A protein has these predicted regions:
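Conserved structural motif at the start of ABC-family nucleotide-binding domains
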Residues: 2, 16-19
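The feature captures the beta-strand-to-loop junction immediately N-terminal to the Walker
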Residues: 32-34
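Helix-to-loop junction immediately C-terminal to a conserved catalytic motif
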Residues: 47-48
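ABC ATPase NBD Q-loop/coupling interface
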Residues: 57-73, 136
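Q-loop/switch helix immediately C-terminal to the Walker
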Residues: 84, 90-104
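ABC ATPase C-loop
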Residues: 152-153
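Walker B catalytic motif
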Residues: 164-165, 172
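Conserved beta-strand-loop-alpha-helix hinge in the C-terminal portion
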Residues: 213-238
Length: 238
C-alpha cells in the first residue's frame, strides 16, 4: 500500500509534480500522461533520487517513506525499473542479482538462485549463459527490459514501479510479460504501478486504477479504465 498526500516534487526550484494525493493498494495500476510531465520523476522521487526535492507525505505500508534512505526503501520492498537501464561493465547479470539479494536480506542460496535466474532467462527467450553476460552491456532495449523482469521475479518486492516495461518487446514477449506481471500480482498483497502508452499491454492487464498526469504537474486517479482506451485512441487532447 502506497499513499501520497500533497506530494510535490521539485527540481532546481521548479515544480514537476504538484500536490499529488494518490492511493495504490494491491493490484495493477497504470500511469499515463504526455511526454515530459513527470511520470519517470514520480518513480525516481519515491525511490529517493537526491536530484529531486520533495514535499508532502508518502506512506508505504504504514511507514514514512520520505524519511528513509534509498537503500531502506528498497529493503522495505520498493522496486523501480528504468526507461533506459544503465550498463555496468565488469558486473555480470547474475552477480548483480546475487549482490542485490544479499543486500535485501533475501535467499542467499547461490545454487538455487542461479537455477531460478537461468529458468527466468529461458522463459524470456534470452541467450544461453545470460547469467554470465555483463549487466546491460551490448544488450538490446528489449533484452534490458527482460533483465529487469528477471530482477522483479527474483527480488520479489512488495511494490514495483515499472517504467515502460513493454519498450523494445515484440508481440510474443509482450504476452510473456503480461503472464509474469499477472503472476507477480497474484501472489497476493503485491502492488504493481506501470507507466505505459501501449494499448495491447494496458488492455491485457486490465488495471484496477488509472492515474493521468497533466502538463501542469497535476494528477487525476480513477477506476474508470475506459478513459485509458479513449486516450489511446484519441490522444490526451481528444
Amino acid at each position: 500500500m502506497l499513499v501520497t498526500q500533497e506530494f510535490t516534487v521539485k527540481v532546481d526550484g521548479n515544480t514537476i509534480l504538484n500536490d499529488l494525493t494518490l492511493e495504490y493498494g494491491p493490484g495493477i495500476h497504470v500511469i499515463m500522461g504526455p511526454n515530459g510531465v513527470g511520470k519517470s520523476t514520480f518513480a525516481h522521487a519515491l525511490m529517493g533520487n537526491p536530484n529531486y526535492d520533495t514535499e508532502g507525505a508518502v506512506e508505504f505500508y504504514g511507514k514514512d517513506l520520505l524519511a528513509m534512505e534509498t537503500y531502506e526503501r528498497a529493503r522495505a520492498g520498493l522496486f523501480i525499473s528504468f526507461q533506459t537501464p544503465t550498463p555496468i561493465e565488469g558486473l555480470s547479470n547474475f552477480q548483480f542479482i546475487r549482490q542485490a539479494m544479499v543486500s535485501l536480506n533475501k535467499n542467499n542460496n547461490i545454487k538455487e538462485n542461479l537455477s531460478n535466474f537461468r529458468q527466468s532467462a529461458t522463459d524470456l527467450g534470452l541467450a544461453s549463459e545470460w547469467d554470465k553476460k555483463q549487466l546491460n552491456l551490448e544488450a538490446s532495449g528489449g533484452e534490458k527490459k527482460k533483465n529487469e523482469l528477471i530482477q522483479l521475479e527474483m527480488l520479489d518486492p512488495k511494490l514495483a514501479i515499472l517504467d515502460e516495461p513493454d519498450s523494445g518487446l515484440d508481440i510474443d514477449a509482450i504476452k510473456i510479460l503480461v503472464e509474469k506481471l499477472r503472476a507477480f500480482v497474484d501472489k497476493g498483497d503485491k502492488t504493481l504501478i506501470i507507466v505505459s502508452h501501449y494499448a495491447e499491454l494496458i488492455t491485457k492487464l486490465n488495471p484496477d486504477t488509472l492515474t493521468i498526469l497533466d502538463k501542469q504537474g497535476n494528477a487525476k486517479q480513477t477506476e474508470d479504465i475506459q478513459i485509458a482506451y479513449d486516450i489511446l485512441e484519441n490522444g490526451f487532447n481528444g
